[in-house]
């Protein structure tokens, strides 16, 4: 499987039979193999995660399906694509036979929309959307504590569901200042993943080496992808001599 970081929270994953496009709102999309089924995921309606331009892909990729958070208004979807679009609430599970078989489970965000857990081609893939430990300096302590409680509760639900992702895409947001690492750290400690790909860092790639320097990341830092630019492409499983990245381009 290949993983391409597009921009912000946008990722393209390619398996032998399917293309999985997550939260593509900005950036340059890599070439898409027309012989493969394309599944387009949108975690919520905010413009840094959702752009109506995704629907233009149907013109050049007829084997397409849209899996959208239920907070996205249905009138945002062109009428001729209604039959190719599904809306998910937290707790929903959807399955397709196409693309080698695909099963999607939605979890509740601590902000808007949903997080996605996708099982396909022998892989388990997690995209957090805005499910994160959104603690902020200057916010009331009770609000922050409630945020952490809700986030960890949702992670425990994921763990209790038996999921252990091969690949996880999780926010690492420098706007949280010294609290930037909390959500990803919680995720790796409670759920875990074979490889974790940071996202939602607003072009501040420095948060990735900053995370790896923290003592708390000692147990998993070699499983954090070294993303340095938009369009960077990785392999999973990663090359044995470069597990922390597996970069191909």
For each of these PLM feature ranges, what is it?
Residues 1-35, 85-164, 229-249:
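Core dinuclear metal-dependent hydrolase active-site scaffold
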Residues 41, 103-106, 168-171, 196-198:
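Short catalytic-loop micro-motif centered on adjacent basic/acidic residues
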Residues 152-158, 177-186:
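A short, acidic, amphipathic alpha-helical segment used as a generic capping/interface helix at domain edges
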């Amino acid at each position: 499987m290949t993983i391409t970081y597009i921009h912000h929270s946008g990722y393209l994953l390619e398996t032998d039979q399917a293309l999985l496009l997550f939260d593509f709102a900005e950036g340059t999309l890599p070439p898409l193999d027309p012989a493969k089924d394309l599944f387009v995921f949108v975690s919520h309606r905010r413009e840094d995660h959702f752009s109506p331009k995704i629907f233009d892909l149907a013109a050049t990729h007829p084997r397409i399906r849209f899996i959208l958070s239920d907070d996205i208004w249905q009138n945002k979807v062109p009428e001729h694509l209604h039959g190719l679009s599904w809306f998910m609430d937290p707790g929903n599970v959807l399955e397709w036979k196409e693309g080698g078989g695909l099963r999607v489970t939605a979890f509740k965000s601590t902000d808007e929309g949903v997080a996605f857990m996708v099982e396909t081609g022998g892989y388990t893939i997690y995209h957090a959307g805005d499910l994160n430990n959104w603690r902020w300096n200057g916010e009331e302590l009770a609000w922050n504590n409630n945020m952490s409680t809700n986030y960890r509760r949702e992670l425990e639900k994921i763990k209790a569901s038996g999921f252990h992702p091969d690949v996880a895409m999780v926010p690492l947001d420098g706007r949280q200042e010294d609290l930037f690492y909390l959500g990803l750290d919680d995720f790796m400690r409670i759920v875990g993943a074979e490889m974790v790909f940071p996202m939602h860092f607003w072009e501040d790639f420095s948060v990735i080496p900053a995370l790896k320097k923290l003592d708390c990341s000692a147990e998993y830092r070699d499983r954090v992808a070294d993303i340095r630019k938009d369009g960077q492409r990785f392999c999973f499983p990663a090359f044995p001599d470069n597990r922390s990245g597996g970069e191909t381009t």
